[in-house]
């Protein structure tokens, strides 16, 4: 298995400098990761630097809380695509899900899917660490209904990250035709292999190089 092609090589910390982002971009070229996952401010740079390379440009929408308005998320998506993003990882409205406002949650996802249609993959971050199993299932079902390409466990900025149990539940819920992305706390090759075995089709990690090289030291970042 070519683990590198399953990895979104990620740098989302607030204090990331241009030098930090360029390092991630160069590593993505070298190791041929699926994508680089960066904050929207770096999308244009990444798109320019990765032109001609088989590495997608992934960014985050409504990140990390998911509490911006639907209109804002849709605008962010269009803006990111205009600047060169080919994948977007959006955060659901977690509070609305917990309130049982499925209509709002679905519309939120749907509007981002429409904004990205034909131009970018949409991954929906459900923030599993804040949800009950019933809420995880509902979030996945609403994501599929709204037309998302992937469901994703975590932002890496909340109280917990991906678990094999959550990946298995998400995979069971969405079926074989929607992707499942494990992110948050995936730091070693062993971690990554467990997630893939549980049903993950993509891994979000900042320790991507350590994972590919099977360096057990991994990394210390939450993502």
From Swiss-Prot:
- Pathway(s) of this molecule: Carbohydrate degradation; 2-deoxy-D-ribose 1-phosphate degradation; D-glyceraldehyde 3-phosphate and acetaldehyde from 2-deoxy-alpha-D-ribose 1-phosphate: step 2/2
Sorted alphabetically, which SUPFAM superfamilies does this protein's record hold?
Answer: Aldolase (SSF51569)
Q: Where in the cell is it found?
A: Cytoplasm
Q: Please give one Pfam family short name.
A: DeoC
Please give a single GO biological process term from the UniProt record: deoxyribonucleotide catabolic process
- EC assignment: 4.1.2.4
Substrates-to-products reaction catalysed: 2-deoxy-D-ribose 5-phosphate = D-glyceraldehyde 3-phosphate + acetaldehyde
Chain coiled-coil ranges: none
Q: Where is the active site?
A: 89, 152, 181
Query: Keyword annotations for this protein?
Result: Cytoplasm, Lyase, Schiff base
**GO: which molecular function terms?**
deoxyribose-phosphate aldolase activity
InterPro entries, per the entry: Aldolase_TIM (IPR013785), DeoC (IPR011343), DeoC/FbaB/LacD_aldolase (IPR002915), DeoC_typeI (IPR028581)
What's the domain of life for this entry?
Bacteria
Q: According to the UniProt entry, where is the signal peptide? A: none
Q: What cellular-component terms does GO give this entry?
A: cytoplasm
UniProt lists the family membership as follows: Belongs to the DeoC/FbaB aldolase family. DeoC type 1 subfamily.
Q: What is the purpose of this protein?
A: Catalyzes a reversible aldol reaction between acetaldehyde and D-glyceraldehyde 3-phosphate to generate 2-deoxy-D-ribose 5-phosphate.
NCBIfam families under this entry?
deoC
Designated name of the protein: Deoxyribose-phosphate aldolase
Q: Which organism is it from?
A: Bacillus cereus (strain Q1)
Q: What is the lineage of its organism?
A: Bacteria, Bacillati, Bacillota, Bacilli, Bacillales
């Amino acid at each position: 298995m070519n683990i590198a092609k399953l990895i979104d090589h990620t740098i989302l910390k607030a204090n990331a400098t241009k030098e930090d982002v360029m390092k991630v971009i160069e590593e993505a070229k070298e190791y041929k990761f699926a994508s680089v996952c960066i904050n929207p401010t770096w999308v244009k740079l990444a798109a320019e630097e990765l032109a001609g390379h088989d590495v997608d440009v992934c960014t985050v929408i409504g990140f990390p809380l998911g509490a911006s308005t639907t209109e804002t998320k849709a605008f962010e998506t269009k803006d990111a695509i205009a600047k060169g993003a080919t994948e977007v990882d959006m955060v659901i409205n977690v509070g609305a899900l917990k309130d049982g406002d499925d209509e709002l949650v679905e519309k939120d996802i749907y509007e981002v899917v429409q904004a990205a249609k034909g131009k970018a993959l949409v991954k929906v971050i459900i923030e599993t660490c804040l949800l009950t199993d019933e809420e995880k299932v509902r979030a996945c079902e609403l994501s599929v209904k709204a037309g998302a390409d992937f469901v994703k466990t975590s932002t890496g900025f909340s109280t917990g990250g991906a678990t094999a149990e959550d990946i298995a539940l998400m995979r069971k819920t969405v079926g074989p035709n929607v992707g499942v992305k494990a992110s948050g706390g995936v730091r070693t090759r062993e971690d990554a292999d467990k997630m893939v075995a549980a049903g993950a089709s993509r891994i979000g990690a900042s320790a991507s190089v350590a994972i590919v090289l099977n360096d057990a030291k991994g990394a210390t970042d939450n993502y």
